[in-house]
Amino acid sequence: MPSARLQQQFIRLWQCCEGKSQDTTLNELAALLSCSRRHMRTLLNTMQDRGWLTWEAEVGRGKRSRLTFLYTGLALQQQRAEDLLEQDRIDQLVQLVGDKATVRQMLVSHLGRSFRQGRHILRVLYYRPLRNLLPGSALRRSETHIARQIFSSLTRINEENGELEADIAHHWQQISPLHWRFFLRPGVHFHHGRELEMDDVIASLKRINTLPLYSHIADIVSPTPWTLDIHLTQPDRWLPLLLGQVPAMILPREWETLSNFASHPIGTGPYAVIRNSTNQLKIQAFDDFFGYRALIDEVNVWVLPEIADEPAGGLMLKGPQGEEKEIESRLEEGCYYLLFDSRTHRGANQQVRDWVSYVLSPTNLVYFAEEQYQQLWFPAYGLLPRWHHARTIKSEKPAGLESLTLTFYQDHSEHRVIAGIMQQILASHQVTLKIKEIDYDQWHTGEIESDIWLNSANFTLPLDFSVFAHLCEVPLLQHCIPIDWQADAARWRNGEMNLANWCQQLVASKAMVPLLHHWLIIQGQRSMRGLRMNTLGWFDFKSAWFAPPDP
């Protein structure tokens, strides 16, 4: 019998007997464990061989045998839990231990660096599962980061300085305003072993042609081996950067036939997905990666929803030794903001917008927040920390305003906290705030009726590119803000848009109301090198490494 199963049987027996040695019979014990008399005898003999108990059998009808426990079920449970932790079987650990506080304590004690069988393993604690990693779908901040570790694209944007770099394409050139040519590397392999072909690249880029920022791609052809020509319907100075974004990452052309591709995707990036469940995401360095192999062999993201209630609990990778703790932080390039929905009467009413943005001002939100949040929130007066576009102007409450509907996406504790503060403030003005909490896909499409939406945006480098690209990618914003998005996209592609002025107009009209900038924090270890937090609050796994202990 496998050791894990035997341990479970012993723990169950110990619990049924309340840990007390006693006189009993095989039949009674077999009934406790719901097994045959013969199997019970085998179990007892095996457990006795392990030194967990003694079984002094008495022969004869009516005679009772002596069962003596030498080991406690709690001790064995702890040993089993340690084994499950080492094997990264978090789902089984939760079932075994049951108590969430105990599970959390065990997980935290095993965070950070681990060195096993010559492999460097990084363990990270996160507050929610990362189940959808499909490029081109509605991805949140953390899923966007993980997708960049799994997939490659024609180009890549350096997370630290925002500069454009080669990826699958080693060079490219603009033949004409409507014609670009990319030269691709041969010998690139997918995680499932197949070599990348031009058809994979063409299929991957054609599948995103329905997205607003890629709708101007007219044709994609390969005139010669490892050469890709992209023809446009309008000029686009940003095209090389656009092809380095997550939607444009390269998938195997048969991706739709592969089982559970969204949660277990296959790319050509530095890490391959080994496991992805509600309790854990495990990715492993891809030995056949065409670039520099990752220095950390394995990254395990353990999911513990309970840390969502901790303001700074977004990403933890510190070990148990307090003296090794090191904190990396940065003010996010983006903010929480209110989005007024022009499709509803109250959302489109300028008086409502002016008054709501006045009473729910950034300073009011921070004032009514608990101290733990005040330390992490910074009043926002623009979509970026460097911008000061919003002005707080006193406004009178519109007559007849009695209720408003606010919608945000779930699995985000700070959304609930901010919404609760808003509810409290509006109630003091005799306005009822009705709150809807929906899943991220529903939020992204924006097809639910709501007066106001509570959103957050994290922009990546370079900001001149990503601010408009991010806002234009979200269907919800296009539904709520009645401007000519296509005309603005054309101006942006031509380099004719003043981005700061464009964003200032959105803020001035109260279509978008910046609320709070958030401090992004990683709780790390001093022994880790190359850990540089990006604008998404994560770090590039393949560039991080562990310094060996001093000799």
Swiss-Prot record:
GO terms for molecular function: peptide transmembrane transporter activity; transcription cis-regulatory region binding. Residues 26-49 bind DNA. GO terms for biological process: negative regulation of DNA-templated transcription; peptide transport; positive regulation of DNA-templated transcription. It comes from the Bacteria. Residues 1-116 form the HTH marR-type domain. InterPro entries: SBP_5, SBP_5_dom, SgrR_HTH_N, Tscrpt_reg_SgrR. Activates the small RNA gene sgrS under glucose-phosphate stress conditions as well as yfdZ. Represses its own transcription under both stress and non-stress conditions; this repression likely provides one measure of control over sgrR at the level of synthesis. Might act as a sensor of the intracellular accumulation of phosphoglucose by binding these molecules in its C-terminal solute-binding domain. Binds specifically to sgrS promoter in vitro. This is HTH-type transcriptional regulator SgrR.
